[in-house]
């Protein structure tokens, strides 16, 4: 394995949506940084079986719905 071509692999803290925290090793951020999750297995509809709306970050979903709202309408 070549030296000094791999990203730094260090310990970070991950905070889930319910406040649960755990330490893991990652190449994300710097040593000791905290990663706050917006969606995780405890809140994502795919894992919870719910049909909850996923938070529209940056208005992307809203813009898409507005742009294509009448595309498949049948009169």
UniProtKB/Swiss-Prot annotation:
Pfam family, one: Ribosomal_L31
GO biological process, one term: translation
GO CC, any one term: ribosome
SUPFAM superfamilies in alphabetical order: L28p-like (SSF143800)
PROSITE patterns: RIBOSOMAL_L31
Keywords of the record: Ribonucleoprotein, Ribosomal protein, RNA-binding, rRNA-binding
Entry's Gene Ontology molecular function annotations: rRNA binding; structural constituent of ribosome
Disulfide bonds: none
Family assignment from sequence similarity: Belongs to the bacterial ribosomal protein bL31 family. Type A subfamily.
UniProt xrefs under PANTHER family: 50S RIBOSOMAL PROTEIN L31, CHLOROPLASTIC, LARGE RIBOSOMAL SUBUNIT PROTEIN BL31A
NCBIfam families, per the entry: L31, PRK00528.1
Function text: Binds the 23S rRNA.
Subunit structure and binding partners: Part of the 50S ribosomal subunit.
Name of the protein: Large ribosomal subunit protein bL31
């Amino acid at each position: 394995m070549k030296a000094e071509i791999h990203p730094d692999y260090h310990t970070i803290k991950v905070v889930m949506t319910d406040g649960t925290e755990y330490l893991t090793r990652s190449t994300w951020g710097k040593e000791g940084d905290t990663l706050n999750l917006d969606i995780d297995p405890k809140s994502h509809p795919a894992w919870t079986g719910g049909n909850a709306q996923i938070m529209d970050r940056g208005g992307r979903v809203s813009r898409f719905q507005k742009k294509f709202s009448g595309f498949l309408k049948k009169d």
